[in-house]
């Protein structure tokens, strides 16, 4: 299954969650496209709820089904709670951290910055969005890319960096201090439904 590249706004409204991270998709019409009001959303079956939750998280991170399942299976081999491990692995991806550092306004934008070679890890350019960061690694913007308007505007508008990261706005440099705890990640996702989906 290919990575979703269609209308993020329509998909956000259908799933009831902001996939861009800005929340703007749901401000005017917080209900699915094609509906005539907020009270006409279909009641889903148990399977439907599980599938919807999987799609929410997959589209949120903008990854295809194969990548998503690979990370899920890897999380299952780790010590601890499967779902929490899964969420932590997703949040430890390079593109996810670039977004959380405030170097990009949206997750899609963060992925593009990585793809186009603007981001460095420990001084070396990394252009793989799925690159899994380890505690202590330093994320920075390539010198030639530091004057990009897209980055400057994002940093200026950013006002919060999670506690598992540190960020120096003057240097455009951040550190992945530690693996995030579940309580520090999206409360809009019920990962247990995803565990149940893949356990069917």
Swiss-Prot record:
Domain S4 RNA-binding as annotated: residue spans: 92-155
Ribonucleoprotein is among the record's keywords: yes
GO biological process: ribosomal small subunit biogenesis; translation
GO cellular component, one term: small ribosomal subunit
Gene3D superfamilies, alphabetized: Ribosomal Protein S4 Delta 41, Chain A, domain 1, RNA-binding S4 domain
GO molecular function list: rRNA binding; structural constituent of ribosome
The entry's keywords: Ribonucleoprotein, Ribosomal protein, RNA-binding, rRNA-binding
Entry keyword annotation includes Calcium: no
Cited PANTHER family: 30S 40S RIBOSOMAL PROTEIN, SMALL RIBOSOMAL SUBUNIT PROTEIN US4M
Family (UniProt): Belongs to the universal ribosomal protein uS4 family.
Subunit organization: Part of the 30S ribosomal subunit. Contacts protein S5. The interaction surface between S4 and S5 is involved in control of translational fidelity.
Record function comment: One of the primary rRNA binding proteins, it binds directly to 16S rRNA where it nucleates assembly of the body of the 30S subunit.
Protein name per the record: Small ribosomal subunit protein uS4
Species whose genome carries this gene: Macrococcus caseolyticus (strain JCSC5402) (Macrococcoides caseolyticum)
């Amino acid at each position: 299954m290919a990575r979703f590249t269609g209308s993020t706004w329509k998909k956000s409204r259908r799933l009831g969650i902001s996939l861009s991270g800005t929340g703007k998709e749901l401000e005017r019409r917080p209900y699915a496209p094609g509906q005539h009001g907020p009270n006409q959303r279909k009641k889903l079956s148990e399977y439907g709820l599980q599938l919807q939750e999987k799609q929410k998280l997959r589209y949120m991170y903008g990854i295809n089904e194969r990548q998503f399942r690979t990370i899920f299976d890897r999380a299952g081999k780790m010590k601890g709670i499967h779902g929490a491990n899964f969420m932590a692995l997703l949040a430890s991806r390079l593109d996810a951290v670039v977004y959380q550092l405030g170097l990009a306004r949206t997750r899609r934008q963060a992925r593009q910055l990585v793809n186009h070679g603007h981001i460095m890890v420990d001084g070396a350019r990394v252009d793989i969005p799925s690159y899994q960061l380890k505690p202590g690694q330093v994320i920075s913007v390539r010198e030639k890319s530091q004057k990009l308007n897209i980055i400057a505007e994002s940093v200026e508008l950013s006002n919060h960096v999670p506690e598992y990261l540190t960020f120096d706005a003057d240097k455009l440099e951040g550190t992945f201090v530690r693996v995030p705890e579940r309580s520090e990640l999206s409360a809009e996702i019920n990962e247990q439904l995803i565990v149940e989906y893949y356990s069917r």
